[in-house]
Amino acid sequence: PTCIPVSGDHQSKLTLMSESLRNDGRIWVPKIKKDAASIREGKISPLDISEDNRDYFLERRYPAFGNLVPRDVASRAAKERCDAGFGVNATGEAVYLDFAAAIIRYGKEQAHIKGEDESNQDLVNKLGTSVIKKKYGNLFQMYEKIVDQNPYETPMMIYPAVHYTMGGIWVDYNLMTTVPGLYAI
């Protein structure tokens, strides 16, 4: 499942987000590792990465499904990108979920329906943001409260998380069980 990565002491655990966000958002990481490192170090923001330098890895790998691949596929792909050094938050364990294209798409659609100027960027952004706010406003508000970034303007940072277990044994992130020195592989 999709979650907000831990971003500081104020957040004791991962915060689960709705999978429905992937219906409209586009998932990406920088194509260049140096850019990912600069983001992790706080030297640049995701808005500094040009469209050409963004890797929409789910759309690239699964063109027929894009960001709507099953969540286990999306989770594995996001973890693989982060493990390869392209993760974007301070820990390197996050990818971006970007709503800019959806805001424009919905904004143009709404302008067309209302008979208004579809080329007016301010109008399109206002109308599109309104649609996204109606669909995901509570999730965006929760995200902004935790991360202190406006997800209507800056891509969200997300990461896969365990949602529930289906039996088995407990292990930590290094696959060590509760028995010291015993690992489950």
Give the ranges of each region predicted by the language model.
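Short FAD-binding loop at a beta-strand-to-alpha-helix junction that anchors the flavin cofactor
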Residues: 174-185
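Short loop/turn motifs at secondary-structure junctions and domain boundaries
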Residues: 149, 159-163
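Short, well-ordered loop/turn elements at secondary-structure boundaries
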Residues: 91, 145, 152, 165, ...
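Structured core elements
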Residues: 5, 96, 165, 170, ...
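Short coil/turn segments at secondary-structure boundaries
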Residues: 154-158
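Active-site and channel-lining beta-strand-loop segments
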Residues: 27-30, 161, 167-173
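An anion/pyrophosphate-binding glycine-rich loop and adjacent beta-alpha core
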Residues: 1-145
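Hydrophobic packing and interface segments
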Residues: 138, 149-153
